[in-house]
């Protein structure tokens, strides 16, 4: 992935994962990539990859089960559609 210089890398990677949630690559209740998998796929630092998961959790798109990993929230597709609609309305 080629990163845009003016946007934090964690936000760019989060956008990719968000798109994958939206297109069904990661359906509700499915596991999302671990921090280490994000590091391997995108070539970013571990701390940056951890920010990806924190950001997606804050948006309500993923949740974590201790010892199990992070998963797509059942409400994630609806939340993404609402956020995109709000962006269009605001723009």
Over which residues does each language-model region extend?
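Extreme N-terminal segment that seeds HTH/winged-HTH DNA-binding domains in transcriptional regulators
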Residues: 1-44, 54, 63, 74-91
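DNA major-groove recognition helix of helix-turn-helix/homeodomain DNA-binding modules
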Residues: 59
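Short Lys/Arg-enriched helix C-cap and helix-to-coil transition segments
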Residues: 63-65, 69
């Amino acid at each position: 992935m080629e990163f845009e210089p003016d946007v934090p890398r964690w936000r760019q990677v989060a956008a990719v994962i968000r798109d994958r949630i939206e297109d069904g690559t990661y359906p509700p209740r499915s596991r999302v990539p671990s921090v280490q998998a994000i590091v391997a796929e995108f070539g970013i630092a571990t701390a940056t990859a951890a920010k990806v998961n924190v950001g997606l959790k804050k948006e309500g798109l993923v949740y974590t089960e201790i010892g199990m990993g992070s998963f797509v929230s059942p409400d994630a597709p609806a939340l993404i559609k609402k956020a995109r609609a709000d962006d269009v309305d605001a723009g």
